[in-house]
């Protein structure tokens, strides 16, 4: 019996320490109490044995270059310059301005449109493969005519062809050539440890209703070249896209994901409870979506998609950078009943209900931001914003230029309505394709509207205020809980409410932090979904008023000079929070939202630089923010 006990001790010690030692043969007393104490003594170095992500990497999963048909009608900056720009090099924009990021990005996905992939450079260069078609010859002659009106009309015709049932110019060879040239370029600029060039493309379906997805490959050119971009000419049905991705994974053994964007412009079509054909959603379709769409792009140039004030009337921060008048191209007006199926927070709530009904939650997604820039330049900083496309690059009057023209003028989008947003933040173990992709798969990500603030969010059952005293909150977070994107494990022992550890540090180039909030969504016993926003930690000595709301942090922005003072707010915030309204029988999700103090919007910088006066309806200040991926609780 004595020998058995000692053997167990040896096994436990060997399992918990890198030091391997055993008892001497025939000597039952070889392991002493001091030996055991030494084995269980904490390492001297607090970093020894650490294998969790310690760095957040910032990038753009949604950038278009001259290779995209719509971008290429105006943009003359190619994919190579897009990679160079993201890596921190200076490039020349289409309009002739020099451009450079304040800091390099860590990763980039050039997601040019699958539809007629690579057509525009081939068309403009007079590629024989393209000019051999009647449409190609007609477009080439028009674009080279020197007649501005004819060129513009042809450009609009080309852009409109993206929504057709068949490509006006069909050349599989041309698409294949453009695709393999791109994947080779991505491999060239991919530099493990310094810069990650993920390979991807955009599937662009349903015209003005924006059911678009960015498809991202985990592997290199050898993997990606086993296919060509799947386009809306192959199918306009996102369910067919998921089946294509499933077949690709089956045939190659590789991994791929899809990120939908701009649900805010889908007019109620993005996050529905029906199939594409309008039938009740099935478990099979829900499982396909959950498998491939683990992330959603919630903020970008074409508006913010986290929440809407009509859906969240008690949320004073829900009205951020709204594009909510119509669908993408202004051909259908927005109706209030459409909003429920467009915004991320509401979709997360819908997912709770579908999870109970189907046994699969198709809307169990994490969050990222990206730009959707069509200039080949990933610019999301307010003072360095080059616009949606090359027709609205910086110049004195771009604030009033048309970005998207609609049949009804009241739905036309003007330059000032663009949001200088956003970026994807990824907690990965290293800056490589594999590590970045794997972090996206596990949803350990957050969205920012541009600033590169550092945000941590953990959920568990035992976090307390002592955990905020460490300068290594992640060590506590991973030990006692799960990170953003995770699922709360079952509580052990006494019934208790979940607790959360949240921390944020400001971007040194941006404003101080106003507050950190936790957004909770849950489904009650009557299967009704609900939400509530809790202020968890904030700057200054503010106290909640009778309505439970904190007073505003203040505003130091000098609009005339496009400056602000970091004399309010905090450079960092950290806190713990325990859900005061928890019911263990109710499924729920929680995510953190970090709000900055007011700072100048890009329009204020523009007015100052060019000495122009903009109309009174143009906003001049902004409160930048970050949204983490949720943490889910399932009874």
What are these model-predicted stretches?
Residues 8-18:
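Bacterial N-terminal signal peptides
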Residues 176, 180:
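Aromatic- and glycine-enriched glycan-recognition loops and surfaces
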Residues 169-173, 189-192, 204, 215, ...:
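A conserved hydrophobic secondary-structure block that centers on an alpha-helix together
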Residues 1-9:
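Bacterial N-terminal signal peptides that target proteins for export
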Residues 134-165:
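Aromatic- and acidic-residue-enriched carbohydrate-binding clefts of CAZyme catalytic domains
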Residues 23-79, 83-140, 168-171, 181-193, ...:
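C-terminal functional module detector
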Residues 240-241:
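Acidic, metal/ion-coordinating pockets
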């Amino acid at each position: 019996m004595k020998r058995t006990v000692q053997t167990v001790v040896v096994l436990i010690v060997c399992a918990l320490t890198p030091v391997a030692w055993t008892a001497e043969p025939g000597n039952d007393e070889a392991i002493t109490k001091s030996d055991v104490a030494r084995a269980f003594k904490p390492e001297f170095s607090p970093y020894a044995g650490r294998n969790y992500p310690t760095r957040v990497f910032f990038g753009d999963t949604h950038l278009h270059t001259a290779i995209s048909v719509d971008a290429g009608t105006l943009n003359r900056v190619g994919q190579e310059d897009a990679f160079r720009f993201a890596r921190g090099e200076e490039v020349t924009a289409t309009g002739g301005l020099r451009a450079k990021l304040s800091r390099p990005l860590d990763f980039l996905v050039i997601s040019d449109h699958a539809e007629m992939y690579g057509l525009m450079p081939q068309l403009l260069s007079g590629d024989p493969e393209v000019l051999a078609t009647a449409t190609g010859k007609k477009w080439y002659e028009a674009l080279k005519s020197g007649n501005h009106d004819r060129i513009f009309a042809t450009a609009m015709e080309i852009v409109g062809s993206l929504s057709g049932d068949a490509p006006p110019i069909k050349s599989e060879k041309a698409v294949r050539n453009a695709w393999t040239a791109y994947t080779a370029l991505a491999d060239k600029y991919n530099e493990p440890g310094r810069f990650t060039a993920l390979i991807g493309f955009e599937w662009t379906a349903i015209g003005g209703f924006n059911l678009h997805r960015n498809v991202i490959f985990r592997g290199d050119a050898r993997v990606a070249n086993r296919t060509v971009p799947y386009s809306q000419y192959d199918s306009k049905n996102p369910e067919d896209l998921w089946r294509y991705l499933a077949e690709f994974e089956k045939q190659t053994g590789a991994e791929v994901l899809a990120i939908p964007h701009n649900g805010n412009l889908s007019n109620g079509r993005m996050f529905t409870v029906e199939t594409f054909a309008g039938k009740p959603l099935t478990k099979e379709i829900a499982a396909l979506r959950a498998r491939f769409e683990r992330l959603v792009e919630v903020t970008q140039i074409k508006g913010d998609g986290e929440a809407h004030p009509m859906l969240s009337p008690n949320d004073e921060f829900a009205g951020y950078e709204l594009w909510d008048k119509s669908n993408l191209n202004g051909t259908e007006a927005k109706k209030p009943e459409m909003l429920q199926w467009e915004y991320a927070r509401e979709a997360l709530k819908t997912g709770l209900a579908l999870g109970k009904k189907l046994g699969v939650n198709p809307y169990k997604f994490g969050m990222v931001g990206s730009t959707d820039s069509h200039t080949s330049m990933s610019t999301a900083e307010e003072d360095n914003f080059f616009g949606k496309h090359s027709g609205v690059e910086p110049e004195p009057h771009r604030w009033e230029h048309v970005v998207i023209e609609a049949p009804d003028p009241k739905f036309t989008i003007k330059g000032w309505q663009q949001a200088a947003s956003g970026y994807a933040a990824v907690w990965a173990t290293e800056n490589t394709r594999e590590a970045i992709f794997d972090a996206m798969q596990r949803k350990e990500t957050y969205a920012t509207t541009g600033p590169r603030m550092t945000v941590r969010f953990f959920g568990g059952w035992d976090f307390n205020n002592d955990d905020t005293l460490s300068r290594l909150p992640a060590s506590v977070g991973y030990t006692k809980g799960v990170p953003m994107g995770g699922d709360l494990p079952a509580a052990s022992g006494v019934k208790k409410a979940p607790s959360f550890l949240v921390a944020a540090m400001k971007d040194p180039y941006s404003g101080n932090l106003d507050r950190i909030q936790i957004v909770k969504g849950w489904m009650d016993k009557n299967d009704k979904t609900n939400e509530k926003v809790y202020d968890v930690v904030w700057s200054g000595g503010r106290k909640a008023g009778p309505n439970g709301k904190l007073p505003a942090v203040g505003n130091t922005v000098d609009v005339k000079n496009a400056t602000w003072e970091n004399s309010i707010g905090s450079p960092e915030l950290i806190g713990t929070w325990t859900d005061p309204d928890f019911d263990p029988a109710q499924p729920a999700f929680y995510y953190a939202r970090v709000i900055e103090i007011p700072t100048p919007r890009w329009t204020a910088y523009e007015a100052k630089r060019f000495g122009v006066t903009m109309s009174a309806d143009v906003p001049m200040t902004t409160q930048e923010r970050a949204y983490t991926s949720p943490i889910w609780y399932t009874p």
